[in-house]
Amino acid sequence: MFHLGMWRERFLNALVEVSEGRPYSPPPEDIDKFNEAELARGIGTPLTDAGSRSDHLFGEILDVYQQVGHAPFQWYLARTTTEAVLRNSYTHPRMHLHAYLLENGDVEAAHRLFEEAAAEMRAVAAPPIVLGAVLYNLACTRSAQGRLPEAIDLIAESLPMRPDMKDAAASDPGLAPLRDDPRFQELIKT
């Protein structure tokens, strides 16, 4: 939660700068190095405090987004405020929650999280950069469930929205059961 709160704060600050018509501070370039240093500073932060702070910041992000609306805004892969809000405050937390659930043996809840994310993002007609990512994640879930034809269909749907994920798909351990399938091989061909 500390990690999510820090990223929400950083993103909120940039969004506020946009709402005020000022140039915004871009996100850090080396994410892994930055996260490692920041997480070390968060050791000892009570989970309830970090969770409350993260939730509060999410509310503030939504308030500022309502002021700014859909506008050009570059934040990593995101090119608009809408894409950035969804990535920062929807898909990013779900990636961490999914990993946590798997690490703690709650495989069904982890699968359900990605199933619900795909359904929700389809329902709101999420931008391709976001929908493609959640469909890719659902493909990994279907692969883990042994539902390989569905996994391939989801990869086929997601990669046109997220061509940047094609290289990752080729080596993603979550898609390993698909590697020998000719249809999958065709999809990841570069």
How should each PLM-predicted stretch be described?
Residues 1-32, 72-115:
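Short, contiguous alpha-helical
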Residues 31-73:
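Acidic/histidine-rich alpha-helical segments that form the ligand environment
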Residues 109, 150, 183-186:
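Alpha-helical positions within canonical tetratricopeptide repeat
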Residues 132, 167-168, 176:
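Start-of-helix signal in alpha-solenoid helical-repeat scaffolds, especially tetratricopeptide repeats
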Residues 137, 171-174:
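"A position-specific structural signal for the A-helix of alpha-solenoid helical repeats
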